[in-house]
Amino acid sequence: MDKRTFLKVGGLAGAGLLATPLVSSLLGCGSAPGPNTNGSETTASGFTLPELGFAYDALEPVVDEKTMRIHHGKHHAGYVRKLNNALKTHTPSGQSLEALLAALTPKDTGLRNNGGGHFNHALFWKVLTPATEQSQQVPAGTLAERIQASFGSQEALLQNLAAAAGSRFGSGWVWLVQDVNRPEKLFVASTPNQDNPLMTGIVDASIQGRPILGLDVWEHAYYLNYQNRRSDYVNAVLNRVNWSEVADLMA
């Protein structure tokens, strides 16, 4: 699915977000198997594990190599494998991961957990960087303007993200989300487990939208290096955000 593919599904078809590239295509998430011309088989094996875009040790000392190898090569790979297995009991449609997630209901446990796990991790890897270039470390252009308008400053945004991570009980994710009805508005949200703001049939309407930054606060993301010091991990990893990539994910 190319970067000019459009999405119109459920709550994601809000004003200003109709003619925008799919987030999942930008992340390299792939798409579900699609039907052959005879409708009896699939033309693809399903979703695939995206490359990191950097070496496993490239985020050290913020995230250690062992954690990265386990997190990407085992946890994320496991979500992809289980997602493809779960899709075997559903009619192949060739739809994007975004469309799949937006159509889920609370009864779709396997697709919810593993589809969410795949998308969430793909986004996480996309917005991390080992680089220290100023252009990547500081929001610029339209993103900077929207952060200023929505939060007052970049520092206030980072404080909001850290606070949301600290208040998330147990496992989950923290998000910077673009409002579906007011694209100029950004807000911070948090979801449990592998839920995300794309799941319009599951998450509360107040946190639905287009996720442009995701922060993993499951213990497997940090425990080897930080043990129970989640706040230390959060503050450190926020210094490895590639704001240029975040900007590219906006509608």
Placement of each model-derived feature along the sequence:
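C-terminal segment of N-terminal export signals and the immediately downstream linker at the start
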Residues: 22-59
